[in-house]
């Protein structure tokens, strides 16, 4: 039989669009780049952790930063999605013990050098918070598809867990 090459695109998630304005001189770090060691969180100063998802990623970095962190969440409780795993109350206990400031029901509107502007989700009242950087823990989206691929799986379709990506990759390979 054949033996021709078949390309399956499996990777490619990138940071999604930001729901806030950011000046060119503002320090905005993508959590994926921080975790990969591509960029580093400044060693000193307040860090705003923007967590529009309410999952473990924003909670984990805020917990690590401790009292330096200001966790901005649109939800009524930090890490709202952790309720499904049973870690909601323990995570909030850890955040409190670490000294993390939590800005609940808060939307991030703009990032400037040295400050962010936030808005109360319900009242619309805006105010500023001083910080040296923002770590964006927002949504990921797939990259543009490659030309002439037989299939797209994993992060090429939408962000996945490692388990989901490996499973989809194996299924795609088995179907070739």
Regions found by a protein language model. Give the residues of each.
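Short, hydrophobic/aromatic-rich segments at coil-to-beta transitions
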Residues: 113-116
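A conserved beta-strand/loop element that lines the FAD pocket in flavoprotein oxidoreductases
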Residues: 1, 96-108
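Rossmann-like dinucleotide/flavin-binding elements
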Residues: 1, 10-83, 119-176
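Alpha-helical protein-protein interaction modules
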Residues: 83-90
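Short polar/acidic secondary-structure junctions
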Residues: 108-109, 121
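Generic beta-strand structural signal
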Residues: 110-111, 152
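Short, conserved catalytic or adaptor-binding loops enriched in Gly and charged residues
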Residues: 20-24, 92-99
């Amino acid at each position: 039989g054949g033996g021709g090459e078949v390309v399956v695109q499996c990777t490619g998630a990138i940071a999604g669009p930001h729901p806030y304005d950011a000046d060119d001189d503002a320090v905005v770090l993508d959590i994926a780049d921080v975790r990969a060691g591509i960029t580093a969180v400044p060693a000193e100063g307040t860090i705003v952790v923007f967590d529009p998802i309410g999952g473990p990623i924003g909670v984990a970095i805020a917990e690590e930063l401790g009292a330096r962190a200001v966790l901005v969440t649109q939800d009524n409780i930090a890490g709202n999605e952790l309720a499904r795993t049973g870690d909601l109350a323990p995570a909030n206990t850890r955040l409190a013990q670490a000294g993390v400031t939590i800005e609940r029901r808060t939307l991030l509107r703009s990032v400037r050098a040295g400050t962010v502007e936030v808005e109360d989700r319900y009242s619309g009242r805006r105010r500023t918070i001083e910080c040296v950087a923002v770590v964006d823990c927002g949504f990921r989206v797939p990259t543009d598809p490659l030309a002439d691929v037989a299939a797209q799986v994993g992060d090429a379709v939408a962000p996945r867990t490692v388990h989901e990506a490996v499973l989809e990759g194996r299924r795609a390979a088995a179907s070739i």
